[in-house]
Design a protein with these regions (language model features):
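Class I S-adenosyl-L-methionine-dependent methyltransferase catalytic core
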Residues: 1-106, 110-181
Length: 181
């Protein structure tokens, strides 16, 4: 068990994180085949999930976002449903792993896909409350220098073109406490 958990989970509609980190996971010996890692990665499109089942597990905020995405891109909506269900599981697991009076700190940002606003922070806050966290503190932080491109083109693809729409211009630090039973 832990007194403090600090994490910055992947963002929905972002990169496939297992692919992005394949070199380091192979080099450090975490897995022999990075494709295995894909199956356990938050929101990965490479492991089976039942869309209808995901919809039934989604929180109200997650369901609202997925429904909006479904109108513009069904495959992204399905991926987002898996991501949000995974994040709900992450907050529950974090709560279970904390000692009483322990804290969990998440760093996450909101994004947009084809003009659908994706409020990851709001979904995470709802998930943390649902998992049992209390006294949530939300800190909004402007991102001034981001190494990975913060822009998307009209098709929703990442680009380095500064005339494109900026995403990930701010992030949220969300801190929750687990009180004694």
């Amino acid at each position: 068990f832990a007194d403090l958990i600090v994490t910055s989970p992947p963002y929905v509609t972002s990169y496939e994180y297992a692919d992005l980190h394949q070199l380091s996971t192979l080099w450090l010996g975490f897995v022999d085949d990075y494709k295995i890692l894909r199956k356990g990665t938050i929101g990965s499109i490479y492991h089976e999930s039942d869309y209808e089942d995901n919809l039934n597990q989604l929180s109200p905020i997650g369901l609202d976002i997925v429904s909006s995405l479904y109108k513009v891109d069904k495959s992204k909506a399905k991926a987002a449903s898996k991501y949000f269900v995974d994040m709900q599981k992450v907050t529950s697991k974090a709560f279970q792993l904390l000692n009483n009076n322990g804290y969990s700190l998440f760093v996450i940002g909101n994004t947009e896909y084809k003009k659908v606003k994706i409020d990851n922070a709001k979904h995470l806050i709802e998930s943390m409350y649902s998992a049992g966290f209390r006294d949530l503190e939300i800190i909004q932080r402007k991102i001034s220098k981001k190494i990975l491109t913060p822009y998307r083109d009209s098709r929703g693809k990442f680009t380095s073109n500064k005339n494109s729409r900026q995403v990930y211009s701010e992030e949220f630090i969300i801190i929750g406490k687990k009180y004694e039973d």
